[in-house]
Curated annotation (Swiss-Prot):
The gene is hel308. This is ATP-dependent DNA helicase Hel308. NCBIfam families: helicase_Hel308 (NF040935). It comes from Saccharolobus islandicus (strain REY15A) (Sulfolobus islandicus). GO terms for molecular function: 3'-5' DNA helicase activity; ATP binding; ATP hydrolysis activity; DNA binding. Monomer. Interacts with PINA ATPase which decreases both DNA helicase activities of this protein. Its EC number is 5.6.2.3, 5.6.2.4.
Amino acid sequence: MSLELEWMSIDDLKLPSNVIDIIKNRGIKKLNPPQTEAVKKGLLDGNRLLLTSPTGSGKTLIAEMGIISFLLKNGGKAIYVTPLRALTNEKYLTFKDWESIGFKVAMTSGDYDTDDAWLKNYDIIITTYEKLDSLWRHRPDWLNEANYFVLDELHYLNDPERGPVVESVTIRAKRRNLLALSATISNYKQIAKWLGAEPVATNWRPVPLMEGVMYPERKKKEYTILFRDNTTRKVHGDDAIIAYTLDSLSKNGQVLVFRNSRKMAESTALKIANYMNFVSLDEKAISEILNQLDDIEEGGSDEKELLKSLISKGVAYHHAGLSKALRDIIEESFRKRKIKVIVATPTLAAGVNLPARTVIIGDIYRFNRKIVGYYDEIPVMEYKQMSGRAGRPGFDQIGESIIVVRDKEDVDRVFKKYILSDVEPIESKLGSERAFYTFLLGILSAEGSLSEKQLEGFAYESLLAKSLVDVYFDRAIRWLSEHSFIREENNTFTLTNFGKRVADLYINPFTADIIRKGLEGHKASCEIAYLHLLAFTPDGPLVSVGRNEEEELIELLEDLECELLVEEPYEEDEYSLYLNALKVALIMKDWIDEVDEDTILGKYNIGSGDLRNIVETMDWLTYSAYHLSKELRLDDHSDKLRILNLRVTDGVKEELLELVQIGGVGRKRARLLYNNGIKGLGDVVMNPDRVRNLLGQKLGERVVQEAARLLNRFH
């Protein structure tokens, strides 16, 4: 799999001088071995390639050269697809360089119920797999001009949640010109054949990686690290992770520690912080970070205070429970070497590029969500993603990745499974009813109408075994027909109006069916019932429900103000989801009743990032439910769902809906204005001095002008 280490001069590329200059202005004089091999395999001639290589090996520049070369020769549009919004933003900033030679670059994600007609004016579009999938369903004319696709992080095909969408997008994209980029995968030849692409596979890294396993010795407070080259090192300390962290810091390195849960990430960060007195920090830089934390509105006050106490010692934790704004500050501070240690959950390894000299993997086990009390070993791919963060180009001569085990007897097994083994082969994740039915609905929405043979042809283009396609295809057609999502006439399948609306809203057909049954079977209901119905769907958000909480939720079921729209299930798994949905509904009820964010976070034991994710998901689901109720002509429900959706979006009572239309006026400022007699747009315009006194001169003036603009638009 390794390539000859051949480096190519930038001047030897068959690209215009202005393109060469942009690359040189980044300080790049030579292409590294993976980049050189991609060029040799016809990257600049538009050849279809699958490039697999480790993190940090320069895959983005390969994509840039491929896109620019193709567009200069052929015109059209190029679409760069990533699995994460954070990566989309990162790539967008990189591609902005090409605007200096005339290419228009755009970024789009979220808001699935639109065709983004404005993108017709752009040449290079950066987006997510989900957003591109939703755009294809809307069939915008401009998308027909897209003739070059870059599929980034293609190993997400193996992700149980994201895999079906990545596969669906890939099936459509591989009918056009494409470049696929992936972390190292074991069955790359099979995937390349599926794509109709030539494989370019390499293990080359810009910084050599030393991998090892760390175990405790019988002698108290002594730990040995056995490295891949059979060398060993000993460290001493109260705790294995702390001991190796301090050892790395003493050599002026930065450290990423991975733990398997949020609580472990936070507690480990606190422990490490207690030992940071000897580490030299830039006090001015630390002070700037603390001021940044004070300036942002996102995030609970408790988590901010905890982070401030840690960051003052050069340490931070990082997990999905934190707000995006807090995570962004932590990541940027680490990149600039202001923070020395981050303790994170594995989600960080799959996200933005954030290398460190040393990576410590504190756990190879994680909780099994389906079986309480059980743990699973992490996949090899997850280990490779974490260890791949070790070694920062330009700063480190080597990167070190260490797995911590509890017993010396585990060393050999862990070494063989994670360090010496290939990652798991990529396999289709369309092999479930939920995934396959959604896939077919999306294909029909994008194509308009297809014969049975044509529709089946798309399914056969998946990675799913033909025998499984045959089983799922017949089931899917039958279920989608019986539930009025599709119709068949003259051996041609099309979507019903309801099916098309479901596809455009980008919700799962099982979600739509649950919503339809809940609404059609009941008269207009209360907020908690609507919220519970939507949270109970397959697209609903999941939250952790403790055993004590379960008992409280069961008691609450008896005291609700109205009848729920979902029948209480008998099966244990379904009942757990039923209680999960009730907790989500209660969180959202407090949110729309303007309960303070800190109170919500403490009451339900969630992070500010969790709350934001729940709000975004329920915003999408209330919006979808409103539009489905309109499609089904359930007017009693649609009136209530429209108001509920608006309240969920901003977290306000109905009386504030007019005020929160004003840019810069959120739930807190709207309540401040309302309680001081400013109850609508007209009041804002008629009382500018009072508004300025309440909000400050600068913001107040902007709010008055925006309110006047909105009033003019409405009249």
